[in-house]
């Protein structure tokens, strides 16, 4: 039996080849926003977004509007948005009493003819113990990371 004690565990991890030229780096929030909207508009099979939350502000509305526009153009498009459940239940800290983003998600869903479901994922029992803070996005066979 071979002793793998001094070998890197990464040598045996599942993997697939990735050419360096297939990786692009975006510099700045505006470049990320434009690429995100471009990928949403161009997706043909699937869009999976994970984020801490989508805020009821200009940026959040722009993303959700783009998702619904893509779904309207391609009704078979599989769209799923995953956000932290606890974070969606409250508004911005210091902004006074707010219903939270979950209320906005529900209202938006009820007023749209298209479906782009937003799932709240309760990672912990309370927000202070940890949140869903993944920043990965899948568009067909393209992966986009943020942060």
PLM regions: where:
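HKD-type phospholipase D/PLD-like phosphodiesterase module
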Residues: 5-42, 57-147
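Gly/serine-rich nucleotide phosphate-binding loop at the start of the catalytic core
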Residues: 53
């Amino acid at each position: 039996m071979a002793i793998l004690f001094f070998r890197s565990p990464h040598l045996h991890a599942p993997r697939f080849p990735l050419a360096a030229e297939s990786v692009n780096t975006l510099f700045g929030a505006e470049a990320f926003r434009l690429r995100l909207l471009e990928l949403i508009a161009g997706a043909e099979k699937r869009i999976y977004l994970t984020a801490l939350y989508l805020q009821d502000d200009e940026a959040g509305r722009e993303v959700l509007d783009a998702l619904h526009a893509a779904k309207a153009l391609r009704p078979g498009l599989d769209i799923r948005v995953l956000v932290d459940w606890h974070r969606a239940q409250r508004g911005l800290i210091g902004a006074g009493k707010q219903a939270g983003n979950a209320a906005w998600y529900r209202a938006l869903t009820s007023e749209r003819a298209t479906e782009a479901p937003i799932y709240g994922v309760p990672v912990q029992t309370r927000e202070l113990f940890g949140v869903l803070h993944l920043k990965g996005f899948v568009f067909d066979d393209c992966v986009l990371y943020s942060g």
